[in-house]
Amino acid sequence: MSRRGNIKRKPVPPDPIYNSCLLNMTIRRVMKSGKKSVAAGIVYDAMTMIKERTGEEPLEVFERAMKNLTPLVEVKARRVGGATYQVPMEVRPARGTTLALRWLIRYSRIRGGRSMASKLANEIMDAANETGAAMKKRDETHRMADANKAFAHYRY
């Protein structure tokens, strides 16, 4: 592990169409093999589908989905005297956003459907309505933290 100080994170520039940093982070996460234009097409198609299906502003639906998916607590393994405990820890906002995006895209990819854009749109709409596989993962993470509340005093 590095003994140097914390690195400064570069600010993520907003995307050109919706002017949202969160959407640009999503495009970067969807991207495979450096094909950013393909990833942007997928994300923007998904946003168009959300607008058609819900009639709401797609960015609002997306932000609501991200707010719902962001975990408040998670468990981290901590070794104490030969035993490993799952210690519940609060999640920093940046990590919470990263986890929410990771889960959203992972469960979009394994979801059934024709195109990645439609799978992503469906997962975003489900998350906005507090259903779907990504929400299930968030709830499971919260349950794990709740079950291991007894080890909270091992925080570091």
Curated annotation (Swiss-Prot):
One of its GO terms (cellular component) is small ribosomal subunit. One of its GO terms (molecular function) is tRNA binding. The keyword Plastid does not apply. InterPro entries: Ribosomal_uS7, Ribosomal_uS7_bac/org-type, Ribosomal_uS7_CS, Ribosomal_uS7_dom, Ribosomal_uS7_dom_sf. Pfam families: Ribosomal_S7. Keywords: Ribonucleoprotein, Ribosomal protein, RNA-binding, rRNA-binding, tRNA-binding. It comes from the Bacteria. The keyword tRNA-binding applies. Belongs to the universal ribosomal protein uS7 family. Part of the 30S ribosomal subunit. Contacts proteins S9 and S11. One of the primary rRNA binding proteins, it binds directly to 16S rRNA where it nucleates assembly of the head domain of the 30S subunit. Is located at the subunit interface close to the decoding center, probably blocks exit of the E-site tRNA. HAMAP family: Ribosomal_uS7_B. NCBIfam families: rpsG_bact. This is Small ribosomal subunit protein uS7. The lineage of its organism: Bacteria, Bacillati, Cyanobacteriota, Cyanophyceae, Oscillatoriophycideae.
